[in-house]
């Protein structure tokens, strides 16, 4: 399982070296949702979601949406 950041405006996932990708399989794994939320805020993202992504079955679950309660 990977922990991903997705920009709500573009629909892209944060990859390595602050690049963005359409493919969640190529996105950076933040390991913990609280770390992902911290990184998203440091980057100044206003509208973002954090997902748990299961690469083996190509499935994702939204666990945090900016503007709502703290990350899981």
Predicted regions mapped to residue ranges:
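Short aromatic-glycine-(Arg/Gly/Cys) micro-motifs in beta-strand/loop hairpins
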Residues: 1-23
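A short, charged, amphipathic alpha-helix used as a generic interaction element across diverse proteins
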Residues: 20-48
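Intrinsic disorder/low-complexity signal
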Residues: 6-8, 28, 57, 69
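Short, mixed-charge low-complexity intrinsically disordered segments
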Residues: 37-72
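Intrinsic low-complexity, intrinsically disordered segments enriched in polar/basic residues
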Residues: 14, 27-28, 52
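Residues in well-ordered beta-strands of folded domains
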Residues: 6, 31, 51
């Amino acid at each position: 399982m990977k922990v991903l950041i997705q920009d709500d405006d573009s629909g892209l996932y944060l990859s390595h070296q602050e690049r963005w990708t359409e493919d969640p399989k190529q996105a950076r794994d933040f390991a913990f949702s609280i770390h992902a939320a911290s990184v998203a805020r440091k980057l100044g993202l206003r509208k973002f979601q954090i997902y748990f992504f299961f690469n083996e079955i190509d499935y994702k679950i939204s666990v945090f949406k900016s503007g709502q309660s703290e990350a899981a």
